[in-house]
């Protein structure tokens, strides 16, 4: 067999295998938020970590989004509607306040409070720790301008 034919066959097989293996963790389909073109979201996106809760970052198909894990267990969207006052619990992790919505548990939805634009993170709590995930995302999200903070009910009723 001619060396050119062998080389061509090797290159073809290598390319097909490479495409097949890379396709196992393809692009995560997401929808951009209404304010995803806000320049502040670009500041967040370029700072997103390569790993979150030991899960590798994945490519997404929407502006100002991020995803980690195969299958994706953490989804981030910047530019979501800025939340107003709420009765949902608010947790502060490393100077970033997050509203916690557990109405679809084990999927937990965390939305920044007091940051414009707002960031939403959906976490599969059966795959990763919510606290660890928010700690890992904190440095990227904390670049957003802080406009207010969570308050406790005791803050409301102080004399």
Where on the chain are the PLM-derived regions?
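Bacterial signal peptide processing site
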Residues: 25-28
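N-terminal secretory signal peptides
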Residues: 30-80
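Bacterial N-terminal signal peptides that target proteins for export
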Residues: 2-14
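C-terminal motif of bacterial Sec signal peptides marking the signal peptidase cleavage site
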Residues: 19-23
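Extracytosolic low-complexity repeat regions of secreted or lipid-anchored proteins
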Residues: 89-159
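Short, charged/polar surface micro-motifs in flexible loops or helix N-caps
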Residues: 80-87
